[in-house]
Amino acid sequence: MSNEHIVWHDSSITKNEYQQKNNHKSGIIWLTGLSGSGKSTIANAAARELFEQGYQVTVLDGDNVRHGLNKDLGFSDDDRKENIRRIGEVAKLFVEQGTIVITAFISPFQEDRRIVRQLVEAGEFHEVFVKCDLNVCEERDPKGLYKKARNGEIPFFTGIDSPYEEPAAPELVLDTGELSREESKQRLVDYVKEKAK
């Protein structure tokens, strides 16, 4: 069956109605950065604080999504693009339901992030660059991935033998080589609360 026979089904509840009930705007908070930069840690800590303050929030994490929805994808450039495309579409559905979606994905290519930005309305996508020098990420190496990549056990590893394209103009930069975990989380929480008004 081709897509031409599939019709979009509008929800009986509008995004505006969800936002009014939640008392905040929805949007995508897209954390991007190298493995080990702190994306997942910051995303989950910020989500916890926002949730405790009454915000409708969810986290989409790169590793978790690859256990289910994207378990069929590898790490070639094409598979990485498809990974981000799928996540963008899922995040868009959450935005339409009035939710603040915090994503934690390496998402190494600028073009892929640009495409996700275009899925939602202006002002609903917020690119957050979780900046951290490669050597610091390698020192942290919480999953032992850099060591494996350096030993040739993991091909196409971002930062080692696959490029990472830093955001040209992110809405927020969290330099986790300089900021503590708590400082990074608080800056993100403050940013989200300001944009969700």
UniProtKB/Swiss-Prot annotation:
EC nos: 2.7.1.25
Keyword match Endoplasmic reticulum: no
SUPFAM superfamilies per UniProt: P-loop containing nucleoside triphosphate hydrolases (SSF52540)
UniProt-annotated catalytic positions: S107
Protein keywords: ATP-binding, Kinase, Nucleotide-binding, Phosphoprotein, Transferase
Positions that bind ATP: G33, L34, S35, G36, S37, G38, K39, S40
Family to which this protein belongs: Belongs to the APS kinase family.
Protein name: Adenylyl-sulfate kinase
InterPro entries registered for this protein in UniProt: APS_kinase (IPR002891), P-loop_NTPase (IPR027417)
Molecular function terms from GO: adenylylsulfate kinase activity; ATP binding
Pfam families: APS_kinase (PF01583)
GO annotation (BP), single: sulfate assimilation
Pathway: Sulfur metabolism; hydrogen sulfide biosynthesis; sulfite from sulfate: step 2/3
Function according to Swiss-Prot or TrEMBL: Catalyzes the synthesis of activated sulfate.
